[in-house]
Amino acid sequence: MAPFVEVCRYKPLPLSLSSLCTCPCRSSPRKYLILPQFSEKYPKPLLSHSRFTPISVNRRVITAVARAESNQIGDDANSKEEHNIDQELQNVEEDSSLDDQKQKSRSQFKKRVTFGLGIGLSVGGIVLAGGWVFTVAVAAAVLLSAREYFELVRSKGIAQGMTPPPRYLSRVCSIICALMPILTLYFGHIDISITSAAFVVAMALLLQRGNPRFSQLSSTMFGLFYCGYLPCFWVKLRCGLTAPVLNTGIGRSWPTILGGQAHWTVGLVAILISFCGIIASDTFAFLGGKAFGRTPLISISPKKTWEGAFAGLVGCISITILLSKSLSWPQSLVSTIAFGVLNFFGSVFGDLTESMIKRDAGVKDSGSLIPGHGGILDRVDSYIFTGALAYSFVRLHGV
């Protein structure tokens, strides 16, 4: 026989099943069962929706319903809490990743600035020293650049569409390129040397085992020209043009033990102006592109813009004019502007040429020799063609 609940004569009180397991303030979509207070006069009916109706109630059923609703409410609360925790963890991970990226960029920027200043001071001292010091430094840079170039040629991106030269021949060509600046200092010109080297390399390619490819010959000849022959013009400019620059203030105050006024030759002044112009061109182009860059310059280098290029041109010409006034060369303003324009175009053309090679190779940097700057070829690409233009300008303009 089912248990009964006796009803007293007092006013019944509403009771929700959800109130058995949760706070009474919580609203519930379920219907209410009104459980009256205890009395001895009546058997135990229940009031449903304020109507006096005898209902047989099993205490286990009430407990099961209350327990099920409690579990459902607890699961909903736990799921919401887990979702909030996951969201907070995701936000924390995103914030930490942003902090890591900012810290990495700051560290990269510090490396670039530190090594950039170190390289700049070292190059300045080498240029001022001239002679064998300058020539050996150029030869070392040429050797490293040639090795990086031939590694780019052998990379997957370029090698898929062509047959690269054999590795032993790439090493031989790198050594030949490094010897060219030294031969330039000793003989004054390397026309016969470069012709002989090109002939020997071409014969080695044609007589190799297997089927020789034109791509091997073309990439090797371009490597000799790009990495070996063109940098030799810096040696010819610094060490070959020995006429002193007159009326220069820094030359008159230069210590006699370091060569005196005769140390400041046309070649030294021209190379200092060219180097500073290239640095100004790269710096102003970078800053101008960051601030005003909208129109892409060329597809092989998507980050370069016309606005940045114009800023680089203005910066190169401005630095050239300032240095020409302090170093008293060139004398005329028109010649100074022309020299600045040549330095700018040589810098841009060299940069774009190396960008084309890296794009075909499918790499971002030519190497990882210099922390924060990439390889040596990434640092000297703007100087490769500029040396030939600067030397030609000085020879045509006259000392």
UniProtKB/Swiss-Prot annotation:
Requires a divalent cation for activity. Displays highest activities with MgCl(2). Disruption phenotype: When associated with the disruption of CDS5, requires sucrose (Suc) treatment to grow. Pale yellow-green leaves with reduced chlorophyll levels but an increased chlorophyll a/b ratio. Reduced plastidial phosphatidylglycerol (PG) biosynthesis leading to abnormal thylakoid membrane development. GO terms for molecular function: phosphatidate cytidylyltransferase activity. It comes from Arabidopsis thaliana (Mouse-ear cress). Its EC number is 2.7.7.41. It comes from the Eukaryota. GO terms for cellular component: chloroplast; chloroplast envelope; chloroplast membrane; chloroplast thylakoid membrane; plastid. Belongs to the CDS family. Optimum pH is 7.5. Pathway: Phospholipid metabolism; CDP-diacylglycerol biosynthesis; CDP-diacylglycerol from sn-glycerol 3-phosphate: step 3/3. It is found in: Plastid, Chloroplast membrane. The chain crosses the membrane at residues 123-143, 187-207, 217-237, 266-286, 309-329, 333-353. The lineage of its organism: Eukaryota, Viridiplantae, Streptophyta, Embryophyta, Tracheophyta. Highest activities is obtained at about 30 mM CTP and 2 mM phosphatidic acid (PA). The keyword ATP-binding does not apply. It is a multi-pass membrane protein. This is Phosphatidate cytidylyltransferase 5, chloroplastic.
